[in-house]
């Protein structure tokens, strides 16, 4: 227990993040299955829209703050960044420990917020006046705000740690332009966290004082404006979605170049600039989430154009991955299957994003299932596919064990069918005008909702199968002899699993 509770070892802390993220992911998945069960037939199942919205809100918060971010940044980031830099550990090992241990209390606060009073049924955006004292009395929203505060502090500390580590602890020979793409992606992600989270903290603190200390930041009666909250929230919220996907971009670059048998990704400098461009542009497009609040036509024109510009660096990344794959004789290992699935489905999600960027179109599609379909394609088939690819790819390094490849391929097919069956029909529902965040719908929408719910059940089976595959691997203890052929990245020069203290003598990297 002491080893885990007080650990300052980046590998142990990374493992804690993985376990925490997997556990939170099961909770978040359970909530999503409840949502799909409710929508699996017309009429009521739970019979209470407040509870339904509490489930939707908790599903979003758990998946974002307690599943994707801990696994990608905390798990893969902690494990791989020091190994890829040739650093003995993170720059601030004890702060690293605190970053992790802030998350269980944060998750507990969120779960408690659902259990007291009526729960926080505000949606993950927590817009006032719905989240204000009149519409949401009681402690639920306050507890959710404190949960976000803790998760935010955790991420800010982690961000400072990663930035410092990369600036100060690169091994001799690893110049910035030769730094692995995954490390670059984590650094850019950390910068985005550092710049966006304080704004969220400000917004939810003002909401807290509006609710409890009689201020009126977001109350027109006292000269406030609920639209101010939306601007503050989305100034955080849009960079946040890039925070969720950028580490995935980094992992996919490594996996594709490795599996293509090439020593680096096509146009790796361009890949770095593309990620920097995405990170920068991510801060100046936030109001595309607010096309329906009545902004000036010139404001809408700007946010439409700026949003579409993000498609350019994203396209550079997609086509560089395809160019990396070009001309190779692929063996379809499980990791490359997930990576190919990522490229294909992330592109679909990106295209629906370009559709929604048009302010005039978005006014029709805003708050319909078209938006739900869009962001689940980039999250449920972008971020999650990247996590799956990365986990399978680096599992032999982390554990020194092998997974059952045949099962993993079957599991990929099950998940691929499941997620597409769940989310593709939602485009049709959105185009037909089915609104988000309602527990019931007119009979006309029944067919595609039934298909979507069947898809979610298939995905659930896929996830359970995945956990069984990991269990089987840990029980069977098949040791790795050679973890990978012709490795293109230095973390593979470690033992499998790596020694508790790798790089106790600093390496010199020559090329």
From Swiss-Prot:
Pathway(s): Energy metabolism; oxidative phosphorylation
Reactions the enzyme catalyzes: 4 Fe(II)-[cytochrome c] + O2 + 8 H(+)(in) = 4 Fe(III)-[cytochrome c] + 2 H2O + 4 H(+)(out)
Residues noted as binding Ca(2+) in the record, renumbered to the chain: 38, 43
GO cellular component: mitochondrial inner membrane; respiratory chain complex IV
Binding-site residues for Fe(II)-heme a, renumbered to this chain: 59, 376
Enzyme class (EC, first level): translocase
Residue numbers binding O2: 242
Record's bilayer topology term: Multi-pass membrane protein
Keywords from the UniProt entry: Calcium, Copper, Electron transport, Heme, Iron, Magnesium, Membrane, Metal-binding, Mitochondrion, Mitochondrion inner membrane, Respiratory chain, Translocase, Transmembrane, Transmembrane helix, Transport
Protein name: Cytochrome c oxidase subunit 1
Organism listed in the record: Drosophila simulans
């Amino acid at each position: 227990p002491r080893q885990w509770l007080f650990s300052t070892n980046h590998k142990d802390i990374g493992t804690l993040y993985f376990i925490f993220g997997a556990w939170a992911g099961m909770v978040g998945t359970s909530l999503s299955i409840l949502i799909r069960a409710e929508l699996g037939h017309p009429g009521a199942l739970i019979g209470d829209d407040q509870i339904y919205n509490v489930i939707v809100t908790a599903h979003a918060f758990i998946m974002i703050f307690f599943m994707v971010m801990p696994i990608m940044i905390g798990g893969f980031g902690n494990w791989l960044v020091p190994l890829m830099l040739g650093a003995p550990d993170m720059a601030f090992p004890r702060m690293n420990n605190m970053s992790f241990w802030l998350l269980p209390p944060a998750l507990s606060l969120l779960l408690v917020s659902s259990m007291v009073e009526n729960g926080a049924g505000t949606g993950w955006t927590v817009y006032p006046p719905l989240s204000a004292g009149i519409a949401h009395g009681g402690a639920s929203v306050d507890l959710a705000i404190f949960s976000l505060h803790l998760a935010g502090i955790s991420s800010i500390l982690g961000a400072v740690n990663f930035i410092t580590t990369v600036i100060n602890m690169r091994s001799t020979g690893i110049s910035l332009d030769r730094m692995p793409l995954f490390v670059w992606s984590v650094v850019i992600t950390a910068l985005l966290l550092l710049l966006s989270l304080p704004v969220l903290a400000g917004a939810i603190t003002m909401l807290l004082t509006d609710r409890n200390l009689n201020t009126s930041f977001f109350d027109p009666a006292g000269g406030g404006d609920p639209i101010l909250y939306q601007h503050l929230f989305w100034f955080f919220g849009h960079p946040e979605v890039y925070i969720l996907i950028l580490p995935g971009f980094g992992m996919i670059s490594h996996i594709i170049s490795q599996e293509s048998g090439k020593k680096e990704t096509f146009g790796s400098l361009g890949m770095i600039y593309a990620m920097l461009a995405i990170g920068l542009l991510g801060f100046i497009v936030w109001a595309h989430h607010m096309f329906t609040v009545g902004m000036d036509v010139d404001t809408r024109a700007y946010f439409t154009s700026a949003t579409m510009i993000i498609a350019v660096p994203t396209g550079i990344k997609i086509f560089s991955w395809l160019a990396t794959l070009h001309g190779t004789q692929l063996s379809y290992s499980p990791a490359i299957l997930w990576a190919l699935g990522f490229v294909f489905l992330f592109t679909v999600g990106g295209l629906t994003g370009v559709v929604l960027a048009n302010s005039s179109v978005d006014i029709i599609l805003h708050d319909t299932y078209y938006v739900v379909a869009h962001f689940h394609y980039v999250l449920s088939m972008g971020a999650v596919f990247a996590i799956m690819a990365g986990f399978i790819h680096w599992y032999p390094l982390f554990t020194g064990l092998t997974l059952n490849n045949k099962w993993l391929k079957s599991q990929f097919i099950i998940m691929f069918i499941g997620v597409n069956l769940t989310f593709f029909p939602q485009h049709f529902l959105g185009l037909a005008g089915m609104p988000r965040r309602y527990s019931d719908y007119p009979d006309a929408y029944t067919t595609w909702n039934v298909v979507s719910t069947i898809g979610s059940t298939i995905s659930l089976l896929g996830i359970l199968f995945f956990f069984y595959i990991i269990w089987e691997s840990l029980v069977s203890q098949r040791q790795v002899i050679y973890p990978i052929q012709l490795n293109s990245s230095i973390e593979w020069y470690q033992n499998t699993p790596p020694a508790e203290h790798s790089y106790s003598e600093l390496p010199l990297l020559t090329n």
